[in-house]
């Protein structure tokens, strides 16, 4: 077995795809200590800076004081605390749905919905750039999976039209795609779902707390909150805690509680995570200026990089991609940024298609204008050195 591991690791190394862990000794703030050195951080999903907010820390500590450090069991045995159900009620109010159910991670939530809802004879229509958890959920279900070209509504319509059978049709898409930060064309997806009698699931991991009124997400951004059957989200990005959730109808929640294996057999979310998430949601709803600052920062950085000659995709989310091309070149650019005191990781296959390795920049509400200008200057400098601009 070890011989096989060595051979496969050698291939990974030769392709420039070796992955290594970095050691952080501070939380994900705009400036961090990584491997013993200070860096500007432009790669965190802590979009609103709530993961290090003192109010969330206080609530997490209070949760531990009252309930302990762990739930002690699954939700269906001994781990269903009153605060679990309070959190679910607050998520449902936040997402404007009848009900919500909490999972231990967004990954488990995606897997749980797709693998339990979709059966043999059903058909899933999945965007080509959907998150790995959606792909794994499709694989675990017994349904047929048809992948449509990324955000290509002509291709989706063609595949819906060509699909026959009496089973359920299920369109699954990220709300905000994690690599490029582009937003799913939800109005057209809703139109096609109605025409072909399909149901819709959105993975709103990167939209929750960012898009829509009060950060409600993608559906609210488009004014389509009543048209979505399942909205999956995470508590670990803009909300600043950890865990995942599904917001849906009351009957669908009850179905997942009884059928989603990733819910039934998971240990319940810890009290500290629950209380931190509740506080994060409250802050998002009551401090809209935090979200506005995030989007303002993202717009500023994107505009300045465009003016510097980088080819940028249009967008308004805090995820900004600089396409470099080859894996080795992307790694070189990232390494040069590290030398300049900036951490922006290179994203390589299999996370993105071959030939599209990139720097994935993520902006936070807590980045200052001085920090934004500094990273712009350093990216411009290295881009010129490498002949990219």
Curated annotation (Swiss-Prot):
SUPFAM superfamilies: PLP-dependent transferases. The keyword Flavoprotein does not apply. GO terms for biological process: biotin biosynthetic process. InterPro entries: Aminotrans_II_pyridoxalP_BS, Aminotransferase_I/II_large, AON_synthase_class-II, AONS_Archaea/Proteobacteria, PyrdxlP-dep_Trfase, PyrdxlP-dep_Trfase_major, PyrdxlP-dep_Trfase_small. Substrate binds at residues 19, 131, 351. It catalyses: 6-carboxyhexanoyl-[ACP] + L-alanine + H(+) = (8S)-8-amino-7-oxononanoate + holo-[ACP] + CO2. Pyridoxal 5'-phosphate binds at residues 106-107, 178, 203-206, 234-237. The modification N6-(pyridoxal phosphate)lysine is found at residue 237. Its EC number is 2.3.1.47. Its cofactor is pyridoxal 5'-phosphate. Keywords: Biotin biosynthesis, Pyridoxal phosphate, Transferase. Homodimer. This is 8-amino-7-oxononanoate synthase. It comes from Lysinibacillus sphaericus.
């Amino acid at each position: 077995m070890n011989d096989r591991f060595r051979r496969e690791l050698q291939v990974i190394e030769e392709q420039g795809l070796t992955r290594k862990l970095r050691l952080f000794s501070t939380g994900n703030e705009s400036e961090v200590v990584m491997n013993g050195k200070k860096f500007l951080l432009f790669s965190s999903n802590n979009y609103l800076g709530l993961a290090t907010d003192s109010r969330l820390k206080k609530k997490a500590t209070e949760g531990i004081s009252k309930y302990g450090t762990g739930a002690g069991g699954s939700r269906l045995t001994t781990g269903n605390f009153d605060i679990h159900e309070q959190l679910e009620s607050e998520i449902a109010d936040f997402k404007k749905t009848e009900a919500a159910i909490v999972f231990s991670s967004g990954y488990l939530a995606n897997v749980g919905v797709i693998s339990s809802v979709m059966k043999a004879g059903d058909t899933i229509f999945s965007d080509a750039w959907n998150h790995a958890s959606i792909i794994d959920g499709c694989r675990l279900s017994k349904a047929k999976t048809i992948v449509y070209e990324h955000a290509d509504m002509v291709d989706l319509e063609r595949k819906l039209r060509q699909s026959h059978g009496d089973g359920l049709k299920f369109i699954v898409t990220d709300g905000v795609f994690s690599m490029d930060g582009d937003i799913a064309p939800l109005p057209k997806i809703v139109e096609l779902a109605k025409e072909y009698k399909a149901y819709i699931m959105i993975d709103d991991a990167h939209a929750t707390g960012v898009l829509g009124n009060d950060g409600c997400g993608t559906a609210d951004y488009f004014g389509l909150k009543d048209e979505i059957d399942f909205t999956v989200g995470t508590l670990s990005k803009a909300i600043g805690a950890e865990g995942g959730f599904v917001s849906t109808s009351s009957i669908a929640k009850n179905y997942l509680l009884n059928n989603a294996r990733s819910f039934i057999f998971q240990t319940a979310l810890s009290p500290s995570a629950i209380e931190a998430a509740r506080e994060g949601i409250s802050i998002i709803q009551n401090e809209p200026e935090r979200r506005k600052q995030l989007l303002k920062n993202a717009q500023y950085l994107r505009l300045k990089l465009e003016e510097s000659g980088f080819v940028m995709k249009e967008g308004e989310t805090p995820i900004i991609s600089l396409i470099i091309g080859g894996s080795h070149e992307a790694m070189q650019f990232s390494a040069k940024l590290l030398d300049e005191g900036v951490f922006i990781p290179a994203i390589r296959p299999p996370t993105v298609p071959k030939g599209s390795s990139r720097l994935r920049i993520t902006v936070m509400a807590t980045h200052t204008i001085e920090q934004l200008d500094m990273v712009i200057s350093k990216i411009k400098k290295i881009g010129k050195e490498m002949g990219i601009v």
